[in-house]
């Protein structure tokens, strides 16, 4: 599949279109990707509300002449200039290798937190609004957002039929599995290659139910994620969230869900 978005998106960054604060994106291989400019590196970036810190890929950082692993500068995203951004340099080869076009990093929750973020998956569009300036959103469900380990989190319940886990899950538009559970609270017995249960692995165990936003979904693709905080039960990824239109109202502490178009 051929994508023309990167060129169009970067042109939009330079021109600042009338719909300031909004940009086209693309959704493939389970993640949302947006055009952005991070510390002068203009490229495609994964947008992920479940990643705590914004990252620039090691290869792109070296090409741009950066030697440090912790950087500070300007990020341009969806027509907005985000000054004073802290960006970590990281090896992202495993995370970006399966994507059909080069990706230079990850826009994380730290940059998004001051804004209202709207995400639609079909067609894929992202909008950032200042507090109190977001357009009307036809929410069907409103969920409380808390913050755990630098990530937004909502309550959800997952079950394999024998065991049930209820806790705080980070909703991630750049997370590539419907749900991943912290390995501090779950494991898969008898897995021949347990590492393949983690991000970028090939195993896709099925979970019987996921209760989220007042609805129960069955036969959900799952996996594990390395524990980072005992209060974080896991993450809910874009393959599941794409059934909705989303509004992350970070200033108000709410996640709003609307039916997909």
Model-assigned labels for residue ranges:
Residues 1-4:
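Positively charged n-region of N-terminal signal peptides that target proteins for export
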Residues 16-261:
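Pepsin/retropepsin-fold aspartyl endopeptidases
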Residues 6-15:
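Bacterial N-terminal signal peptides
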């Amino acid at each position: 599949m051929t994508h023309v978005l990167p060129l169009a998106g970067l042109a939009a960054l330079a021109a600042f279109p009338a719909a300031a604060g909004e940009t086209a994106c693309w959704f493939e291989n389970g993640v949302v990707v947006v055009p952005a400019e991070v510390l002068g590196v203009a490229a495609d970036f994964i947008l992920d509300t479940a990643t705590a810190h914004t990252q620039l890929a090691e290869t792109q950082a070296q090409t741009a002449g950066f030697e440090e692993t912790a950087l500070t500068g300007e990020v341009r995203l969806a027509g907005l200039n985000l000054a004073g951004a802290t960006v970590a340099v990281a090896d992202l080869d495993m995370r970006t290798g399966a994507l059909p076009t080069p990706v230079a990093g990850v826009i994380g929750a730290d940059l998004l937190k001051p804004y209202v973020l709207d995400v639609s998956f079909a067609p894929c569009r992202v909008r950032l609004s200042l507090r109190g300036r977001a357009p009307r959103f036809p929410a069907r469900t409103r969920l409380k957002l808390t913050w755990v380990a630098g990530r937004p989190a909502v309550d959800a319940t997952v079950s394999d039929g024998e065991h049930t886990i209820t806790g705080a899950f980070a909703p991630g538009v750049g997370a590539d599995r419907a749900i991943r559970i912290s390995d501090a609270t779950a494991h898969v017995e008898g897995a021949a290659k347990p590492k393949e249960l983690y991000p970028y692995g090939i195993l896709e165990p099925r979970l019987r139910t996921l209760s989220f936003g007042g609805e129960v979904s069955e036969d959900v693709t799952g996996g594990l994620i390395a524990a980072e905080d005992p209060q974080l039960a896991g993450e809910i990824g874009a393959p599941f969230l794409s059934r909705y239109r989303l509004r992350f109202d970070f200033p108000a502490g709410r996640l709003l869900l609307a039916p997909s178009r």
